């Protein structure tokens, strides 16, 4: 049986000192975590080495917030798999809506990152999602289909997590109805053609909606932004019922 993956994306938050304080409060809150789930946290690059000294638990792993498709070279501001693996990083987020928006990241680039992550021994968490305008025009399924087909070409679904993050729900307080999110996740599973692929939902996930989200048949985890910055809130999400 696949484990649920509860992932926190800290984005551009948390210094090394703040990371240490967070983990010292957070880890005792998840010590009795059920064995059907795993927690993954993506700290900023500067805090990864601090985090790595706390990641020797079976239920807690580190993710990178991005990854390049080469191991070294003249790629200013990028980071390579071998740099991350040195610090016990196991996962890498790729294709998040923010680099798609702010840096015009394409499905082709996302695919290169995902494929190289897998070939380097990391598990990519590939984000897909539609804008509010696309949703209102009835284009959500078409957009998701394109992102999955182009962004996940030549990837191994047995070493892959897909995060469905409707862009209009990220950091807005608006949450996609759990049943609607489940339909998109079912579509993604059908497109992948592998029943055991892990599919997360992301977008204003909070302690007061996690139980409903995780009750859905095709949702196997969550990718959490703001609520992962508070150890008490994130521990409640991790200990969903």
Curated annotation (Swiss-Prot):
Q: List cystine links.
A: none
Under the heading Pfam families, the entry gives: TIM
Entry keyword annotation includes Glycoprotein: no
Enzyme category, top tier: isomerase
Q: Name one GO cellular component term.
A: cytosol
**A GO term (biological process) for this protein?**
gluconeogenesis
Kindly state which reaction or reactions the protein catalyses. D-glyceraldehyde 3-phosphate = dihydroxyacetone phosphate
Statement: the UniProt record of this protein carries the keyword Mitochondrion: no
Which pathway is this protein assigned to? Carbohydrate biosynthesis; gluconeogenesis; Carbohydrate degradation; glycolysis; D-glyceraldehyde 3-phosphate from glycerone phosphate: step 1/1
Q: What is its EC number?
A: 5.3.1.1
Q: Where does this protein hold substrate?
A: 9-11, 171, 204, 225-226
Q: What is this protein called?
A: Triosephosphate isomerase
């Amino acid at each position: 049986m696949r484990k649920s993956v509860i992932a926190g994306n800290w984005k551009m938050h948390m210094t090394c000192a703040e990371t240490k304080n967070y983990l010292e409060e957070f880890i005792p809150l998840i010590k009795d975590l059920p064995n059907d789930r795993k927690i993954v946290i993506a700290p900023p690059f500067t805090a990864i080495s601090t985090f790595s000294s706390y990641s020797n638990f079976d239920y807690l792993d580190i993710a990178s917030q991005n990854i390049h498709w080469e191991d070294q070279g003249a790629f200013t501001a990028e980071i390579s798999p071998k740099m991350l693996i040195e610090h016990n990083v196991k996962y890498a987020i790729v294709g998040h809506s923010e680099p798609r928006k702010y840096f015009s990241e394409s499905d082709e680039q996302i695919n290169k990152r995902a494929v190289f992550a897998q070939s380097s021994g990391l598990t990519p968490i590939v984000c897909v999602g539609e804008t509010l305008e696309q949703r209102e025009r009835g284009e959500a399924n078409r957009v998701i289909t394109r992102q999955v087909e182009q962004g996940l070409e030549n990837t191994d679904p047995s070493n892959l997590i897909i995060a469905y993050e409707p862009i209009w729900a990220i950091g807005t307080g608006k949450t996609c109805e759990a049943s609607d999110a489940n339909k998109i996740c079912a579509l993604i599973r059908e497109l992948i053609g592998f029943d055991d692929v892990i599919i997360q939902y992301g977008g204003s996930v909070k302690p007061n909606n996690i139980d409903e989200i995780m009750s859905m048949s095709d949702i196997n985890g969550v990718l959490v932004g703001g609520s992962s910055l508070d150890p008490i809130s994130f521990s409640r999400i991790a200990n969903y019922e």
